[in-house]
Curated annotation (Swiss-Prot):
Residues 1-104, 141-535, 560-583 are annotated as: Disordered. It comes from Rattus norvegicus (Rat). This is Serine/threonine-protein kinase PRP4 homolog. Serine/threonine kinase involved in spliceosomal assembly as well as mitosis and signaling regulation. Connects chromatin mediated regulation of transcription and pre-mRNA splicing. During spliceosomal assembly, interacts with and phosphorylates PRPF6 and PRPF31, components of the U4/U6-U5 tri-small nuclear ribonucleoprotein (snRNP), to facilitate the formation of the spliceosome B complex. Plays a role in regulating transcription and the spindle assembly checkpoint (SAC). Keywords: Acetylation, ATP-binding, Centromere, Chromosome, Isopeptide bond, Kinase, Kinetochore, mRNA processing, mRNA splicing, Nucleotide-binding, Nucleus, Phosphoprotein, Serine/threonine-protein kinase, Spliceosome, Transferase, Ubl conjugation. One of its GO terms (molecular function) is protein serine/threonine kinase activity. The keyword Transferase applies. Phosphorylated by CLK1. Autophosphorylated; phosphorylation inhibits interaction with its targets, such as PRPF6 or SMARCA4.
């Protein structure tokens, strides 16, 4: 019961208490003095000032203003104290007697009123007397004012047995009230609309606003001296106290109900509430009646009025709905879909949004009593919830009614935005910002209506029970702030990002970019159509870009029969217009499968076809390539290097038959820690070694058959027996397990690890069998020529999928090159292997020699922090090599590597150079590149300072070379050139992302 007691009663200052006690005495004697109502009014005004100054606090008001406020406040306080003292001198009654008389009369009153109201309700129910909507509204105003007049009169007179003069005065007041209420409500609404339009015209003119506020204040003060001031103050009290207005605003947003249903429900509700009342409450209210105009009285009045006004509202809301859409477009733009009167709509100023988190939390708790009152009531009264069917129906009606306005508002360019707005609304407040933006309809989503989060539920009773007067004031000041806030659209958008919290974290498909989300939600949130600002331009450009992406997507879909097209209507999904990463992955995977089916035996034929396209002139370029090859392979720390027939290996006796060299039986490990492999031996009692594949920095690899698995072929990688290599081997084992667990269906083209074991103190890893690596493929089929564009496209798709999996597992491979990419027998499927250099993305130690040199990204060379971009760079270099058969950057040193990269892309950005730890090795103090080369004659190092480096290497010419390409292939080569340009950006921040690469035309469009 204590929860229903408004905390405002507790919060009011002491002098208010004294003031109120004086008033209750006057009420008992049936005399309501002029200065009392004036007093009441001035108190009301004082509070209002207080509230405004609270808001102005955020607006950095000047010292003069503050002093003025202070003086004003003190003047009122002094005035009040004097009045209170005078009044208390006049009165001589003991407080105890006063209370008893007052409260007995009140209780008696209330009982009789309840009986009267019930009878009235029953009569109305029987007769169903009210028909027309306008009549209803008028009647609502009349009956409301009548009740108010009567009830206040009774409360003031104390007993029913008081003199006749008081009743006549009551009648006069009733008529007075009727007229004044009508006139005042009309004039006020007019004033408000005029006020609002004025303020919109003079955006940012705060001084003007202040003057207006002062003017309106003085007017009200003048009014308070007029004879009808008593009825006015009553009317104001009614406005703030009765929940009917609050309910009406709720009804506007809510659904129209049948009046009959409404009456029955209201009766039931009335009964329940009456039953709940207990003597304890009355006891408590008795004590409180000294301090305020008996809150029990007010509460009961409001309850009765609430039940009576329900049936009026149901029809009234219909009429309001009809009227509202006829507002001016500008008004619509500002108020969004929620067309309420300004005093009633809880808006949020941008200032509120940019509060500190703590303040924001507090203000959120205390803010919008209306909204929360409505929420708490909805959750508490089951009678108020509609069936989902009816709710949906009325919602669709509402939407139809709103559609023409939206069309009128949106210019042709902003139409996609409207679609998305519609979609956002349908997605039931998918973005957390929706909750706070004034342009959103608040009680639209059925989810919110049905249930509230426990936090909000626990908070709402506190918010609900706020003093009616303060509620009224806060509502007014909020509307004032909202009007001002329109001039600060830009600020609102900037500050909104601070409030943002990811409510639906993980609901989007993985890999979806955060930037895309925020741009589709944030920028489209509440967009002023009139303002053509920076945000609008950016937004339109984004939409145009998306349209281009869509165009490519549909082109791809036309040729891609195997993949079902994504629903194209923007309303069908809450995602951004571009296809989701998962859809892209599916499409690419399907492409790879199709390529595998179609090209089982065509690999060699396609390579020969490419050879035939080349002209005879090519031969003179091959000698240079041969010179580079040894350098390339000395760098090779590959587990499958096709180099195992070297003199060193033969000298070590590796690969010889077991019987030929029986001395090796006891000596399993050579001087460098490599395992001495013997053909025919059995490892771990099950793997029968039948062939030797090769040797890398960390290990050597053998082919074997698994006796335990029906002689299934496997590859066994035997790690070198030394501490560092063992450590590296265990790390690789960990990463492989992680990758395999993340890809149970083997869609992402990373090598599968079957198991591991130890053999003669060597860690052995058992892999799926694959025939050769891409270095061998290039050597065998595409020496100096490269592979067919079809094969390169398929390989690039598979490599990007592998990168996608690595990123999901937060792993950097850090050694991608043709040597570490294995292919199957038909050369259609590839797998990324050798995770010996891999690391977790967070453990990226800065070292200038990470990754094989030709595939090393510039950020590694200059010692800048790096991430997934280094693997993307390596893939770019590999793709170029696969198509041309030539190494893209065959640098002899890191310095030479930088020079070659800048020959292709121009000078490295200064911003990037400054971040490099090793920048001084390659750049001088003015950030000019120092090219270090060896003089051919003197064989001494010479340094050439290059302030500007212009791109001289033509990628397209290198890709096409001397080929006479048919049109379809030429188009694909142009696309490959475009993709490589984006992959090989010197600044990793500007480099293409994996998702973008998967959406690139080269990947998406078939040949």
């Amino acid at each position: 019961m204590a929860a229903t007691e408004p905390p405002s009663l507790r919060e009011q200052p002491e002098m208010d208490d004294a003031d109120n006690s004086e008033k209750s005495v006057n009420e008992e004697n049936g005399e309501v003095s002029e200065d009392q109502s004036q007093n009441k009014h001035s108190r009301h005004k004082k509070k209002k000032h207080k509230h405004r100054s609270k808001h102005k606090k955020h607006k950095h008001s000047s010292e003069e203003d503050r002093d003025k406020k202070h003086k004003h406040k003190h003047k009122h306080k002094k005035h009040k104290r004097k009045e209170v003292l005078d009044a208390s001198d006049k009165e001589g009654l003991s407080p105890a007697k006063r209370t008893k008389l007052d409260d007995l009369a009140l209780l008696e009153d209330l009982e009789k009123q309840r009986a009267l109201i019930k009878a009235e309700l029953d009569n109305e129910l029987m007769e169903g007397k009210v028909q027309s909507g306008m009549g209803l509204i008028l009647q609502g105003y009349e009956s409301g004012s009548e009740e108010e007049g009567e009830i206040h009169e009774k409360a003031r007179n104390g007993n029913r047995s008081s003199t006749r003069s008081s009743s006549t005065r009551g009648k006069l007041e009733i008529t007075d009230n009727k007229n004044s209420a009508k006139k005042r409500s009309k004039s006020r609404s007019k004033e408000r609309t005029r006020h609002r339009s004025d303020k919109r015209k003079s955006k940012g003119a705060v001084e003007m606003m202040r003057e207006k506020a002062n003017r309106s204040k003085s007017k009200e003060r003048r009014k308070s001296k007029s004879p009808s001031k008593r009825s006015k103050s009553q009317d104001q009290a009614r406005k703030s106290k009765s929940p009917t207005l609050r309910r009406r605003s709720q009804e506007k947003v809510g659904k129209a109900r049948s009046p009959a249903d409404e009456k029955i429900k209201s009766e039931e509700k009335g009964k329940i509430k009456d039953r709940k009342k207990s003597p304890i409450v009355n006891e408590r209210s008795r004590d409180r009646s000294k301090k305020s105009k008996s809150p029990v009285d007010l509460r009961d009045k409001s309850k009765d009025r609430r039940s009576r006004s329900k049936e009026r509202k149901s029809k009234r809301s219909e009429i309001d709905k009809e009227k509202k859409p006829i507002k001016s477009p500008s008004k619509d733009a500002s108020s969004g879909k929620e067309n309420r009167s300004p005093s009633r709509r809880p808006g949020r100023s941008p200032k509120r949004r940019s509060l500190s988190p703590k303040q924001r939390d507090k203000s959120r708790r205390s803010r919008s009593p209306l909204l929360n009152d409505r929420r708490s009531k909805q959750s508490k009264s089951p009678s108020r919830t509609l069936s989902p069917g009816r709710r949906a129906k009325s919602r669709s009606l509402e939407r139809k009614r709103r559609e023409p306005e939206r069309r009128r508002l949106s210019s042709p360019r902003t139409r996609p935005r409207d679609d998305i707005l519609g979609r956002c609304e349908r997605s039931k407040d998918a973005s957390p910002i929706n909750r706070w933006s004034p342009s959103r309809r608040r009680s639209r989503s059925p989810i919110r209506r049905r249930s509230r989060s426990p936090l909000r539920r626990s908070r709402s009773p506190r918010r609900r029970s706020r003093s009616p007067r303060r509620r009224d004031r806060s509502r007014r000041s909020r509307s004032r702030l909202r009007r001002r806030s329109r001039s600060r659209g830009g600020h609102r958008r900037r500050s909104r990002s601070k409030v943002k919290e990811d409510k639906f974290k993980g609901s989007l498909s993985e890999g979806m970019k955060v930037e895309q989300e925020s741009s589709s939600d944030d920028n489209l949130e509440d967009f002023d159509v009139e303002e053509e600002d920076e945000e609008a331009v950016i937004e339109q450009r984004r939409i145009q870009r998306q349209a281009i992406v869509q165009k490519y997507k549909y082109l791809a879909e036309d040729s891609n029969i195997s993949v079902p097209s994504e629903p194209s209507s923007p309303q069908s999904s809450t995602r951004s217009r571009s296809p989701s990463p998962d859809d892209i992955l599916e499409r690419v995977a399907a492409d790879v499968k199709e390529y595998e089916r179609e090209n089982v035996d065509t690999f060699e034929a396609s390579v020969k076809a490419k050879h035939n396209l080349m002209t005879v002139e090519q031969n003179n370029g091959s000698s240079q390539k041969k010179l580079l090859a040894p350098d390339m392979f000395t760098e090779s720390d590959d587990m499958f290097a096709a180099y195992f027939d070297s003199a060193r290996l033969r000298a070590a006796g590796i690969g010889k038959d077991f019987k030929e060299n029986p001395n090796l039986r006891d000596n399993w490990t050579d001087a460098e820690g490599y395992y001495r492999v013997n053909i025919g031996e059995v490892l771990d009692k099950r793997y029968n070694v039948y062939g030797y594949t090769g040797q890398g920095v960390f290990s050597n690899v053998v082919r074997a058959r698994d006796n335990a698995r029906a002689n299934q072929e496997v590859a066994v990688k035997i790690i070198r027996n030394n501490e560092l290599m063992q450590k590296t081997g265990l790390k690789e084992l960990e990463f492989l397990k992680k990758l395999n667990d993340a890809d149970p269906d083997d869609k992402f083209h990373c090598l599968r690890l079957f198991r591991h074991f130890y053999h003669k103190q060597h860690l052995c890893l058992v892999f799926e069998p694959l025939s050769m690596n891409l270095r061998e493929v290039l050597k065998k089929y595409g020496k100096d020529v490269g592979l067919h564009i079809k094969a390169v496209r398929s390989y690039s798709q598979q490599l990007f999928l592998a990168l996608k999996l690595l990123k999901r597992c937060n792993i950097l491979h850090a050694d991608i090159k043709p040597d570490n990419i294995l292919v199957n027998e038909s050369k259609t499927i590839l797998k990324l292997c050798d995770f010996g250099s891999a690391s977790h993305v967070a453990d990226n130690d800065i070292t200038p020699y990470l990754v094989s040199r030709f595939y090393r990204a510039p950020e590694i060379i200059i010692g800048k922090s790096y991430d997934y971009g280094i693997d993307m760079w390596s893939v770019g270099c590999t793709l170029y090599e696969l198509y041309t058969g030539k190494i893209l950057f065959p640098g002899k040193t890191n310095n030479h590597m930088l020079k070659l990269a800048m020959d292709l892309k121009g000078k490295m950005p200064n911003k990037m150079i400054r971040k490099g730890v090793f920048k001084d090795q390659h750049f001088d103090q003015n950030l000019n590149f120092m090219y270090i080369e060896v003089d051919k004659v003197t064989e001494r190092e010479k340094v050439t300072v290059m302030s500007t480096i212009n791109p001289t290497k033509d990628l397209l010419a290198d890709l096409i070379g001397c080929q006479r390409l048919p049109e379809d292939q030429r188009k694909k080569v142009h696309q490959l050139k475009d993709l490589l340009d984006q992959i090989l950006m010197l600044d990793p921040a500007k480099r293409i992302s994996i998702n973008q690469a998967l959406q690139h035309a080269f990947i998406q469009e078939k040949i």
